[in-house]
Amino acid sequence: MKNDDLYQKGMEIRRTLHGEESFKKSNTVTYGDPLMTNFIKVATTSVFGALWARPGLDLKTRALVVMISDACTGQEAELHIHMIFALKQGWTQEEISEVLLQLMGYIGAPKIREAMLIAVKVFAEYEASLKSAKKASKKSAKKPTKKSTK
């Protein structure tokens, strides 16, 4: 695949993982700075376009794998992002919690404690975003249509 193709595939995958609103926000807020724009272009091509797009694992499994990697290496900011990806790909809060607890015997309680504290925040944010989206959906469904008066 050419770099342009990898970049486009990476953009599709990032959009899928983030969701449209979060994807747009990350591109303008997090990656709006020229330095960060260069970072995300390379990451979109080489990580999302080349690695996440590989055959053999679905996005749901890949989201869990990177979340586990972040917990094991203490990458707290990335863990936050990838935990949201895992939730959006269908992993439940209970499954994510159990995965983290399973890791405790292998990477230690301190790292898992930090990961669990992040999970508390992520789960609360995720629940709030679901409620907000549901509320917005109900509002838009209730809006009366304007009748034309001729």
Q: Whereabouts are the PLM-identified features?
A:
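Mid-chain, well-packed structural core segment of small domains
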Residues: 64-67, 71-97
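Short gly/ser-rich anion-binding loops that grip negatively charged ligand groups
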Residues: 55, 69-76, 105, 109
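Preference for long, well-ordered alpha-helical segments
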Residues: 95-119, 126
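Short alpha-helical scaffolding segments that buttress acidic/His motifs in well-ordered protein cores
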Residues: 43-47, 64-69, 99-106
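Short, conserved micro-motifs enriched in small and acidic residues
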Residues: 59, 63, 110
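Acidic, glycine/proline-rich low-complexity segments that act as flexible tails and inter-domain linkers
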Residues: 1-59, 88, 114-150
